Swiss-Prot record:
Physiological role: Dermonecrotic toxins cleave the phosphodiester linkage between the phosphate and headgroup of certain phospholipids (sphingolipid and lysolipid substrates), forming an alcohol (often choline) and a cyclic phosphate. This toxin acts on sphingomyelin (SM). It may also act on ceramide phosphoethanolamine (CPE), lysophosphatidylcholine (LPC) and lysophosphatidylethanolamine (LPE), but not on lysophosphatidylserine (LPS), and lysophosphatidylglycerol (LPG). It acts by transphosphatidylation, releasing exclusively cyclic phosphate products as second products.
UniProt protein name: Dermonecrotic toxin LvSicTox-alphaIC1aiii
Gene Ontology cellular component terms for the protein in this record: extracellular region
GO BP terms in the entry: killing of cells of another organism; lipid catabolic process
C-alpha cells in the first residue's frame, strides 16, 4: 500500500498511520541537477494539497529516523520508498549528474555512509526513458564511494506509461537486469483503463520479461481498488491507504493478498 505524494515529515507518520507500508515522494531538482526539495506543485491529485515541501536532505534525515530500528520515530511497517524524480526540468545530458548527486545525498543523509542508516528499500522512478543515464550515474557513484553493496536496496521504475517493449529496451541500455517495479496510472482526477497494467502483469508473469512487480496509481475508489487487485497487481498507490486496507480485508481478497513486511523480497516476482 503505497502512500501517494508524501512530501513532508509529518505526512510520513500520517500515511503510515493510515496503513501504508510504502510511500511515494516527489523530488524536484535545481538547474545544476541537484535534488532540491520534496515537492510536487500544481497541478496535483484532486482533493490533495499540492504545496507540501521539504528540503530534500532534511526529508532524507527524517526518513532515515522513520526507518532505523530503535529510533524514537521508527515505523517498523515502512519498508519501501519510491522517489518520483521530477527530472522533466533537466536537460537530457544532465541525467547522469542527477544520478550522481542523488546517490551522494542518499549515501550521506539516508544511508549514513553505510553506518546503520535507514533500512527501507528505495525505488528510483524516472519519468522519461531518455534519462536512463541517471541510473548509470547513481550506480557508478555508489560503487566509486565503496558502497556498491547498497545497490541491493535499490530498484527502478519508469513512470511515463511508455510501451513496455520500449521500457525493456531502455533497461537493456542501462544495464538493468532486475529490481524492476513497473507503474501504470493517471491522476485520480481522470479515469484510465487497466489494459496497460494487464500487459505489465503479463510481462511480469511470462518469465522472460524484465518486470518483477507492477503497481497502479492513483487508486482512491473502492471499485478501482478491487479492479486493480483482480488484475493481480503487486502494489496500489493511493491517497487513502485506509480504503485499500478496508478492501484487502474483504472476503474476496484477504486470503489472496497480504501487506508485505521487511522479510519479503521486493525484487522477487511472486509466484502463485
Amino acid at each position: 500500500i503505497m502512500g501517494h505524494m508524501v512530501n513532508s515529515l509529518a505526512q510520513i507518520d500520517e500515511f503510515v498511520g493510515l496503513g501504508s507500508n510504502s510511500i511515494e515522494t516527489d523530488v524536484s531538482f535545481d538547474k545544476q541537477a541537484n535534488p532540491e526539495y520534496t515537492y510536487h506543485g500544481i497541478p496535483c491529485d484532486c482533493g490533495r494539497s499540492c504545496g507540501h515541501s521539504t528540503k530534500f536532505n532534511d526529508f532524507l534525515k527524517g526518513l532515515r529516523k522513520a526507518t532505523t530500528p530503535g529510533d524514537s520515530k521508527y515505523h517498523e511497517k515502512l519498508i519501501l520508498v519510491v522517489f518520483d524524480l521530477k527530472t522533466g526540468s533537466l536537460y537530457d545530458n544532465q541525467a547522469y549528474d542527477a544520478g550522481t548527486k542523488l546517490a551522494k545525498n542518499l549515501l550521506q543523509h539516508y544511508w549514513n555512509n553505510g553506518n546503520n542508516g535507514g533500512r527501507a528499500y528505495i525505488i528510483l522512478s524516472i519519468p522519461k526513458l531518455n534519462h536512463y543515464k541517471l541510473i548509470t550515474g547513481f550506480k557508478e557513484t555508489l560503487k566509486n564511494e565503496g558502497h556498491g553493496d547498497l545497490l541491493e536496496k535499490v530498484g527502478h521504475g519508469f513512470s511515463g506509461n511508455d510501451d513496455i517493449s520500449e521500457v525493456q529496451k531502455t533497461y537493456n541500455k542501462a544495464g538493468v537486469t532486475g529490481h524492476v517495479w513497473q507503474s501504470d496510472g493517471i491522476t485520480n482526477c481522470l479515469l484510465r483503463g487497466l489494459s496497460r497494467v494487464k500487459a505489465a502483469v503479463a510481462n511480469r508473469d511470462s518469465g522472460s520479461g524484465i518486470i518483477n512487480k507492477v503497481y497502479y496509481w492513483t487508486v482512491d475508489k473502492r471499485s478501482t481498488t478491487r479492479d486493480s487487485l483482480d488484475a493481480k497487481v503487486d502494489g496500489i498507490m493511493t491517497n487513502y491507504p485506509d480504503i485499500t486496507v478496508e478492501i484487502l480485508n474483504e472476503d474476496a481478497y484477504k486470503k489472496k493478498f497480504r501487506i508485505a513486511t521487511y522479510e519479503d523480497n521486493p525484487w522477487e516476482t511472486f509466484k502463485e
